[in-house]
Swiss-Prot record:
It is found in: Cell inner membrane. It comes from Acidovorax ebreus (strain TPSY) (Diaphorobacter sp. (strain TPSY)). It is a multi-pass membrane protein. The gene is mraY. The keyword Cell wall biogenesis/degradation applies. The lineage of its organism: Bacteria, Pseudomonadati, Pseudomonadota, Betaproteobacteria, Burkholderiales. InterPro entries: Glycosyl_transferase_4, PNAcMuramoyl-5peptid_Trfase, PNAcMuramoyl-5peptid_Trfase_CS. GO terms for cellular component: plasma membrane. This is Phospho-N-acetylmuramoyl-pentapeptide-transferase. GO terms for biological process: cell division; cell wall organization; peptidoglycan biosynthetic process; regulation of cell shape. Belongs to the glycosyltransferase 4 family. MraY subfamily. It comes from the Bacteria. Its EC number is 2.7.8.13.
Amino acid sequence: MLLMLTQWLQGLSPELSFLRVFQYLTLRAVMAALTALLIGLIAGPKVIRMLTSLKIGQPIRGYAMQTHLSKSGTPTMGGVLILGSIAISTLLWFDLSNRFVWIVLAVTLGFGAIGWVDDWRKVVNKDPEGMRSREKYFWQSVIGLLAALYLVFSISENSNTRVFELFITWVQSGFLMDLPPKAGLLVPFFKEVSYPLGVLGFVILTYLVIVGSSNAVNLTDGLDGLAIMPVIMVGASLGIFAYVTGNAGYAKYLLFPYIAGSGELLIFCAAMAGAGLAFLWFNTHPAQVFMGDVGALALGAALGTIAVIVRQEIVLAIMGGIFVVEALSVMLQVTWFKYTKRKYGEGRRLLKMAPLHHHFEKSGWKETQVVVRFWIITMLLCLVGLTTLKLR
């Protein structure tokens, strides 16, 4: 919005040519981060007071750890603060004609809406389970598939072909029609190695990355500050990849596919980092507010969508290794429990408690130890992911 305003003002008078500085993507990214940070810090106390007055407190499951019982009643749904800060800052500083930022915003707010309904049911109905899994997964799938279809259309080589005609062509090919090389699954650490994906493969991969990332971040959000800092670090790192893939010169030099327009995603990533830091100010132990599903589902979906656009799905799995391991710990725990119950008559557990962060708590780690150590691991994984920019 401000970019268009400065361009209009420059056209009015040559004396306003200094506003040309706002054409620089990096400057707008810094401003987006600062704007989101300030919005979050200023609005944070008011949002917390509002949530408290509405008695929107976090219900604690009956099987929760004893050390967590004191958190019952802590305001939740603080993710609205994060999403509001991101949305306002992004809309102010990005190029409104950029389709990639719009789709990321749409997916983020869509998954945020799912999380909002889930949190609201937990609070109003006093039901720690919230939305039933099938219902939640259904709506996640709807948004994930719509996003996947939009993205596969946006990267088609036949950009001048009408959408309906292109869709008919894909149907006739059984959705196996090849896509441009830049739409392939990029393999990190190898020079110009990518796995070609047809339309169907791209849609399935995109769907899995968005929905999987969303739920993985949600499962990680179980301790004060545990999820938000890794989201900040992974998001900032993806912003660097977006900047590279959106710059023809850098993309060519570093052997990345050039994706026109993806650089503007740096604005969103910067806003997400700023909003995340502001939220962490209130979410650090002992937390004054929790982000809830409205924040966790949305932020995870945002990371997944950005990774798909900049073709860094595997790198996302590396940098977000904590999210991956947390999700796998739950899947393995549930699978093993059901298998042993069917075979031996009683369920057995691989971990003392899932997700993994609770296992470490049960093993004697303090909450702050788990959180900070997971932060350190994420920082190292992000550095590994960033090395793929050059080590190819």
